[in-house]
Amino acid sequence: CIRDREKSDALGAMDKFYNDAYSLISSKEAREAFDMSKETDKMKERYGQNQAGQRMLLSRRLVESGVRFVSMTYGGWDMHQNIEAGFNKQGPELDQAFATLISDLDERGLLDSTLVMMSSEFGRTPKINKDNGRDHYPRVFSVAMAGGGIARGQVYGSSDAFATAPEENPLLSLIHI
């Protein structure tokens, strides 16, 4: 029956996908990429001895080992209360780690072939709320991109003076429409 064959083809493709994925993560190269003891203390300090730094260092190691797509998270940005204290802790950590990732990839000759993107799922309200935080705001937010052959030092688009709406070259996604 054709339906049985379609199911069989789909299951076979799924099996192949899972086997390929397992082969990738269980390979010698992957094990070595995840072995952070191979990095010098100086390099670990350069990225930062915190979640942002060590995750971005691991991301570089994965790219270096040939992984074609790396996604990392650095949570704790949902600051509905006391945004100043939260941002004063996380902002410098993220800034150090991201800047180091970009310069490290560039120094290793990997930046032009690696597109690095940093984004959030939405922006934050332009005004501080009653709890000294900011709430979800999908109308305006930023994405930072580097490498992958894109021009350096460019800014695309802008918001109005109060960051309440896109002003120049707005980009939309179906998620936010």
Features from the language model and the residues they span:
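Ligand-binding pockets and gating/stacking loops
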Residues: R3-I175
